[in-house]
Amino acid sequence: MDKFLKTVDRISELSGKGVSFLVIPLVAVILYEIIARYVFQNPTIWVHETAQMIYGAYVILLGAYVLQRGGHVNVELLYGRFKPRTRAVIDLVTWLLFFYFCGLLLWKGGEMAWDSLLLGETEPTTFAPPVYPIKMMIPLGSFLILLQGLAKFIRDLTLVITGKEAAHEH
């Protein structure tokens, strides 16, 4: 089981670090627009949508990495005062909602991405970029976060049953 948990953590870490490089083209296209608009008085028709798509992929694909690092929003008012085992019991209950939501996102997002691909869907703008690449990020990101959620669930279950924490890689 430790090998599975470490593999999932490694996938989340590598995907997160890889996806973090999307900031470079994001900044580049925005900088290009600033220069084109304010220096050359020649704004583009493509930067806004391109930046949205890059940022969308960035946010969707970083979910698993952020989950692995414990970076998602948490209500700490009472939760932080509980012992680790009690927190794990609470987390086991909330994981059920997590799996439902992310499973639904994977399923419906996958359908939406597939339909978009088959239709060759494009944005209804002058630039008209294809939409399916960004829509494909939804099921991919959902799968990655589900996988990391499963690893967290197993760790919480192990803590509740044995009183000992399972191995973490970060």
Predicted regions and their residues:
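Alpha-helical transmembrane segments and membrane-interface helix-loop junctions
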Residues: 1-170
